Amino acid sequence: MQLATWNVNSLTVRLPQVLDWLAANPVDALVLQETKTTDDKFPHEAIQAAGYHVAFFGQKTYNGVALLSRSEITEVVKNIPNFEDDMARVIAGTVEGVRVIGAYFPNGQAPDSDKFVYKMRWLEALQHWLREELQQHPKLVLMGDFNITVDDRDVWDPVGLKDTIHCTVEERAHFQALIDLGTHDAYRLFEQAEKSFSWWDYREFAFRRNRGLRIDHILVSDALKSSVQACVIDKAPRKNERPSDHTPVVVTLG
């Protein structure tokens, strides 16, 4: 079973790229972030024509998430229960007995901003909900754009970016709290090349110079850890014309 995550930074713009990628990489499930489209304009017919069921949750201009699956999607949940939020950030569903949660974590803007306070509140709510989800669904995968680097290996310039957004002690502590619930960073279960990133700024030729961050993650539960066979970052879509600034991350379960 292969599952993937991709922040597409506008599905309207990137739909042809998503369909091309799925044709070349027919994963069993794919979660998308920053679809940036309302539900009435979501291209579900094109996705279904490609052989995928889909659950989606969007809004105009910002945010938006979707879960695509070759198998039926059941027990769909949108956003974190009991956490008041008008941002479309979370889509969850059960696929072939695996609970799949796709999430677009808040950016946070800057450590001294109101948006950072919101990010901390959101992360705490996610932690409480994930604990409940793991109890109900031992086989669980949480994946998406976390907007958090796990440690300095995930940062192109760890000295220059120390304590900036995505790299703060507070954000990393919240990431560790998710791990402590009984999940594992699938990418780090394997030896990986140094300076491996999933996001590169559009500016200053960042992709060409490999000045990026690893902020797109796949967490697998204890019950799935032994079945993880590979986890890779597919940089090819970042080379497309008019690409997303993120690229897909793919995990293979045996």
Task: Please annotate each region the language model reported.
Residues 1-53, 60-65, 150:
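N-terminal, active-site-proximal structural segment of metallo-dependent hydrolase catalytic domains
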Residues 116-137:
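A long, amphipathic alpha-helix that forms part
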Residues 48, 76-79, 151-254:
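Metal-dependent phosphoester-hydrolase catalytic domains
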Residues 6-7, 22-40, 100, 130-152, ...:
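Active-site beta-strand/loop signature of hydrolases that rely on acidic residues for catalysis
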Residues 35-38, 42-110:
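Structured beta-strand-rich core segments of catalytic domains in phosphoester-bond hydrolases
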Residues 81, 106-123, 159-163:
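Surface-exposed cleft-lining segments at the edges of enzyme active sites
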Residues 39-41, 64-65, 110-112, 149-159, ...:
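Short catalytic/ligand-binding loop motif for oxyanion handling, primarily in non-cytosolic enzymes
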Residues 1-10, 97-112, 143, 246:
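Active-site-proximal beta-strand elements of phosphoester/diester hydrolases
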